[in-house]
Amino acid sequence: SQIQGFLDIPVDNLAGNPIFVDYYAKKYGSECENMMVVSPDVGSVSRARAFAQKLHMNLAIVDKRRQKANSCEVMNVIGDVRDKDCILFDDMVDTGGSLCNAAKALIEVGGAKSVQACASHGVLSGPANERIANSCIKELTFLNTIPPLEGACSKIKYLDVSPIFADAIQRIYEENSMSCLLYTSDAADE
């Protein structure tokens, strides 16, 4: 959404998070009671909180300190994740270091029962695939906004965003409102 102001043409920021909400609601249904959404860092709290509210789950936070670009040291887990099935919710995964460290902290420091993760964009550069394969993350789900990684480990799954794009194209063509597909100030639909 930040790029919208820098272009000379109309740009619409389509919301992908409803795809994740639908996926987890269908996957777990009423079993969500023992689950918790986790923000992998303090900067992602508002996005993760909105996601947790949509799924009627509680929120925890992994407090970390970044030593340099593409590396971090996980410091603490804020919130009671003991014996909970956790969903780490992030915007993108590049090398996977932050995400895998957060998952490890949830298990080792917080006592979580299990960890899965989702992120809108799977960049997956460098050691990401190997890190994810060797991590305690049970499943990592992305939207297919970036072409899937060839040879991705079996933990990685992609959800299709084409229905949102198709709906947007149809709405533009028919000159209908786009508001239900766009980013709003409510981070739940980001």
What does each model-found stretch correspond to?
Residues 26-43, 47-154:
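PRPP/pyrophosphate-binding module of the type I phosphoribosyltransferase fold
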Residues 62-63, 162, 182:
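Beta-strand->loop->alpha-helix junctions that form or flank phosphate-binding loops
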Residues 183-188:
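Conserved small/polar residues in nucleotide/adenosyl-binding loops
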Residues 8-11, 153-160:
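Active-site regions of enzymes building and remodeling cell-envelope glycoconjugates
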Residues 156-179:
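C-terminal functional extensions of proteins
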Residues 17-21, 67-69, 148, 161-168:
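A short acidic, often aromatic-flanked loop/helix-cap motif at beta-alpha or helix-coil junctions
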Residues 1-28:
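Active-site-facing substrate-recognition patch
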